[in-house]
A protein has these predicted regions:
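Nucleic-acid endo/exonuclease domains
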Residues: 1-98
Length: 98
């Protein structure tokens, strides 16, 4: 698991946000999201450097649109967001589930 995911997982595990149980590496059809809370149908994805090429961004959009078809809300952050502003990331996640 990439370092940013390890850091964010420390904040998400154990129902720390409004009692929401997050799972790591959760499958949705042919795709896997980094973190998922079934109770609130919320996917959280962290993007590393490999996600910024044109092809990768196109793939990410297709993937996100597929996942959203199931009524799943999708939050996307960069690894840098986690490294430099994990509290802001957590606030955004909290606001998505309350």
């Amino acid at each position: 698991m990439p370092k940013a995911e390890v850091i964010l997982w420390q904040y998400l595990k154990g129902k720390k946000i409004n009692g929401c149980k997050f799972r790591r590496q959760f499958g949705v059809g042919p795709y896997v999201v980094d973190f998922y809370c079934a109770e609130f149908k919320l996917a959280v994805e962290l993007d590393g450097d490999s996600h910024f090429s044109e092809d990768a961004q196109k793939h990410d959009i297709e993937r996100q649109e597929y996942i959203e078809q199931f009524g799943i809300k999708f939050l996307r952050f960069t690894n840098k967001d986690v490294y430099t502003n994990v509290n802001g990331v957590m606030q955004t996640i909290y606001e998505a589930i309350v």
